[in-house]
Amino acid sequence: MGYGHYEPLRHYAEVHLRLSPAPRGSGISFDSECPTDILAQNWQNLVRTHVFEKKHKGVLTGSELCDVKVTLLTGRSHLKHTEGGDFREATYRAIRQGLGTIAASGQNDTAGALLRFSISLESEQAGRLMADLQRMECSFGSPQMEEERMILEGRGPAAVLSGYGREFISYTRGKGVMSFWFDGYEPCKHQQEIVEQIGYQRERDLENPSCSVFCSHGAGFPVPWDEVQNYIHCK
């Protein structure tokens, strides 16, 4: 569950979302289980728009959120104070709050980008190349020989392949050729190492807040993501 509330003075919106894992490569999808007599259709349409209008960041590494189904469960507007931008704030915060809750429960997966590659080099350097690819946990097919050169095709993690070029150029003396194509995402095998290496601090990402804003005595005040459930208005 993700809860987002946005209520500085003379503004109001609250959104409750369910975040569910989706099939790999399916991207972000949206559905609503909220009756229109609870939250009017025009506000629900805005929530949907705000789900799709930006690339939402995950809370572990700040990487783009992918392969998630977002379901609107309930929400609330205010007849006098709600403006269109209020549901943008509430929706963004609900997604981040939900991701924080999932991460705290240990159920969050970090997806790493994959690259498909084609590498051509002199056959005498083939052993070094294949040993390096195995070390980087890449998969590849059988080598193809063209005169005195070998061509190898496969796929592997972008995080390691993208930094391999300098080493490759060095031991092939500039005679090797590498070509890469993006090939989707898959769960990282070494998630904790990657999280520590990137060092993303979500509390400092002011453009993607996880907290909500409530109002008391005519003034808005922030509530940390892990306390929002104690303050929400929709039950």
Question: What are these model-derived regions, one by one?
Answer:
Residues 1-235:
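Accessory interaction regions appended to the cores of large information-processing enzymes
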